[in-house]
UniProtKB/Swiss-Prot annotation:
GO CC annotation terms, alphabetical: cytosol
InterPro entries on file: Aa-tRNA-synt_II, aa-tRNA-synth_II, aa-tRNA-synth_II/BPL/LPL, EpmA, Lys-tRNA-synth_II_C
Protein name: Elongation factor P--(R)-beta-lysine ligase
Binding site for ATP: 99-101, 241-242, 297
Enzyme class per UniProt: ligase
Keyword line: ATP-binding, Ligase, Nucleotide-binding
Domain of life per record: Bacteria
Subunit structure: Homodimer.
Alphabetical list of HAMAP family matching this protein: EF_P_modif_A
Catalytic activity from the UniProt record: D-beta-lysine + L-lysyl-[protein] + ATP = N(6)-((3R)-3,6-diaminohexanoyl)-L-lysyl-[protein] + AMP + diphosphate + H(+)
Oxidoreductase is among the record's keywords: no
Length: 322
């Protein structure tokens, strides 16, 4: 072990700037009347999303004969929606979340998330509020908005909602995806979006991409105007995905169906099956108000604010140095 390994990966000046930005985030929401909340980091329920890998730990209690597996939070979404169901009104949270994925310049397995929910906001109104926050923190230009379909046609040259599987495979091969013919439609779309769209947008101003394909709805409602798309959006700026938001699904039966479909896909992929969060579904059944919500990566926001290229430069200690 190096004698210098004890030192922080962020400079003290950066940590001072980080604290100032986090204080400004709290001020932004306080001025708008949102309640700051705290929810558990540990839960007996993991997440079914096939794209997320969850850390686990064991609860060892003298009052229990068996150890209990608990999962570290990948997002405070489920407990925050339980608060909404209980009548909290508009809420926000700044918290640590954990995703068992590789570390790199843009990723850390432990990172800080800002998540907030707005009862009776539609997707477009929440997009505007994310834009307001970015201008407030970054002093940047107003965001540009475009649909997923438009962005795909502009930068990939095909319509993602109507293109055939063969056309998607052909395009993916142009971008050097090996064994493209083995991949499903969503994997091909996500690959093409990552390599051909993300690299071209948000260079000079933030960009909001909305109406992702319905097959990528996650916890978003399906659009009532076009059932091929979901009321889901993402923000991109300076080469980083900053935020992911939804007009939230509030139908407990549909949400249960999506969880079950996730677990079926997990089984096909050889991934662990996760127990469905019945407390969350009970809250949906009891009645979560129509709302929109969004999660934003705070460390990435700070990277942009300070002009830094590596996430380890904005956190006190990297995972390798923790």
């Amino acid at each position: 072990m190096s004698e210098h390994q004890w030192k922080p990966t962020a400079s003290i000046q950066t940590l001072l700037s980080r604290a100032k930005i986090i204080a400004e985030i709290r001020q932004f929401f306080s001025e708008r009347g949102l309640l700051e909340v705290e929810t558990p980091i540990l839960s007996e329920f993991g997440v079914t999303d096939v794209h997320l890998s969850t850390f686990s730990t064991k609860l060892i209690s003298p009052f229990q004969k068996k150890e209990k597996t608990l999962w570290l939070s990948t997002s405070p979404e489920y407990p925050m929606k339980r608060l909404l169901s209980a009548g909290s009104g508009a809420i926000f949270q700044l918290c640590k979340v954990f995703r068992n994925e590789e570390a790199g310049k843009k990723h850390s397995p432990e990172f800080t998330m800002l998540e907030w929910y707005r009862p009776y906001f539609d997707m477009y109104r929440l997009i505007n509020e994310v834009d307001d926050l970015l201008q407030y923190i970054l002093d940047c230009e107003p965001a540009e908005s475009m649909s997923y379909q438009f962005a795909f046609q502009e930068y990939v040259g095909i319509d993602p909602l109507s293109a055939s599987q063969d056309k998607l495979i052909e395009k993916a091969k142009e971008y050097c995806l090996e064994n493209a013919e083995r991949e499903d439609r969503d994997t091909l779309l996500q690959f093409l979006f990552n390599v051909a769209v993300e690299s071209q947008i948000g260079k000079d101003k933030p960009v909001a991409i909305y109406h992702f394909p319905a097959t990528q709805a996650a916890l978003a409602q399906i659009s009532s105007e076009d059932h091929r798309v979901a009321e889901r959006f993402e923000f991109y700026y300076k080469g980083l995905e900053l935020a992911n938001g939804f007009c939230e699904l509030t139908d407990a039966n549909e949400q249960r169906h999506r969880f079950e479909q996730d677990n079926k896909q997990r089984e096909r992929l050889g991934l662990p099956i996760h127990q469905i969060d019945e407390r969350f579904l009970a809250a949906l059944k009891a009645g979560v108000p129509n709302c929109s919500g969004v999660a934003l990566g705070v460390d990435r926001l700070i990277m942009i604010a300070l002009g830094l290229e590596n996430i380890n430069e904005v956190i006190a200690f990297s995972i390798e140095n923790a």
